[in-house]
Amino acid sequence: MEMVLPVANATAAALARVSAMFNAPLARAVVFGIHIDGHLVVEGLLIAAILFQLSRKSYKPPKKPLTEREVDELCDEWQPEPLCPPIKEGARIEAPTLESAAGPHTIVDGKEVVNFASANYLGLIGNEKILDSCIGSVEKYGVGSCGPRGFYGTIDVHLDCETKIAKFLGTQDSILYSYGISTIFSVIPAFCKKGDIIVADEGVHWAVQNGLQLSRSTVVYFKHNDMASLASTLEKLTHGNKRTEKIRRYIVVEAIYQNSGQIAPLDEIVRLKEKYRFRVILEESHSFGVLGKSGRGLAEHYGVPIEKIDIITAGMGNALATDGGFCTGSIRVVDHQRLSSSGYVFSASLPPYLASAAISAVDHLEENPSVLANLRSNITLLHKELSDVQGLEIASNILSPIVFLKLKTSTGSAVADLELLEVISEKVLKEDSVFIAATKRSSLDKCRLPVGIRLFVSAGHTESDILKVSESLKRVAASVL
């Protein structure tokens, strides 16, 4: 400040002197009887100079055409940027090749293996009743639907499937999507727009992350499955902030987290939702057909009225042994998607035989509730057998069909951790014919939860299958870790 004041004062004094000089009697002139001050003369000259510059033609240097030799040299020197960045060695994926259906037992690279790498929770892959329904549907409708739902792609079996799912879950209506992961990342942007607030779990999988990004909403993450962190986040966003009262607000969670096998505490989430007036989007790809007394998902598991969940989505490729996905809820929620959800509007509809398979799978679940008891028995047995694996610990919930093993002591680097886990997976497959997989994540995946080995338990696994994978993991982990 001490330096600025003298400079400012000196500048003001200089301007005053210049102004006084131009307004002095000697600087005044009389033209045609009109008194003209000196500063008007200066301003007139400036205007004349500006007009002169604007009226001049722009200067263009003479162009000399390049010779053919110069053109060739420039072409030879040009180095185009690569279409995509080079793949790092650690990012290369050499996945085993399956040569049969991905049931409890499958063939990998010509060898029969026990399969714990595919989500086939109810063991319905290869089910005769489902296969017969698919064959009948192909004979009646053909293989594909040949168009989006709004353009001659709606077939009666699609409507039957939507009605079946809504009736099974006790919701007003449902809507089918042609691809599992496109369901959630189409539904989120259909409802969440720029300026809205989304509070999401930091452990959500890539498809949910993609939906959050496409929505262009303001996204705030809370600690993985931590209700204290969720409550704190909601409080910070709403306390004393009148702006948040006027915009849409959502909580986005998974029922069973693909990246950890943890189960979301829905009762507490609903309590916080009602307290802070948020809406809930629940992703149930790994809980539909699994959790609850009759497999109706997380709401049945916690005894929460399903009407309290605003939007529910799920893929049908995990429990129902088919493909595609669905969103269910109120009639208003479903109707909005028929014109606003990109995955529904712009994609060819679900092949009719896959919709028939979904209907048959739900029928099978209703007629054979014992399949859930078999699944839970297998999960419990696997947890018991893997409780003392050297260097590994179970991070998943006891009721989750995803049994997630992570390192007890991390190396400090996710890349190094993954390399160790991949070595274990490869040795288990090569030496004991047990197919398991480590959790690979792309550079676009924002999830920062620990990597691990993910085992998908099926009701179709036998006790000997469970014991085999347990013994193999114990032996290999002891030799590697």
Swiss-Prot record:
The keyword Ligase does not apply. It catalyses: L-serine + hexadecanoyl-CoA + H(+) = 3-oxosphinganine + CO2 + CoA. GO terms for cellular component: endoplasmic reticulum; endoplasmic reticulum membrane. One of its GO terms (molecular function) is pyridoxal phosphate binding. Its cofactor is pyridoxal 5'-phosphate. Pathway: Lipid metabolism; sphingolipid metabolism. Its EC number is 2.3.1.50. Keywords: Acyltransferase, Endoplasmic reticulum, Lipid metabolism, Membrane, Pyridoxal phosphate, Sphingolipid metabolism, Transferase, Transmembrane, Transmembrane helix. It is a single-pass membrane protein. The chain crosses the membrane at residues 32-52. GO terms for biological process: ceramide biosynthetic process; sphingosine biosynthetic process. Heterodimer with LCB2. Component of the serine palmitoyltransferase (SPT) complex, composed of LCB1 and LCB2. Belongs to the class-II pyridoxal-phosphate-dependent aminotransferase family. Serine palmitoyltransferase (SPT). The heterodimer formed with LCB2 constitutes the catalytic core. This is Long chain base biosynthesis protein 1b. It comes from Oryza sativa subsp. japonica.
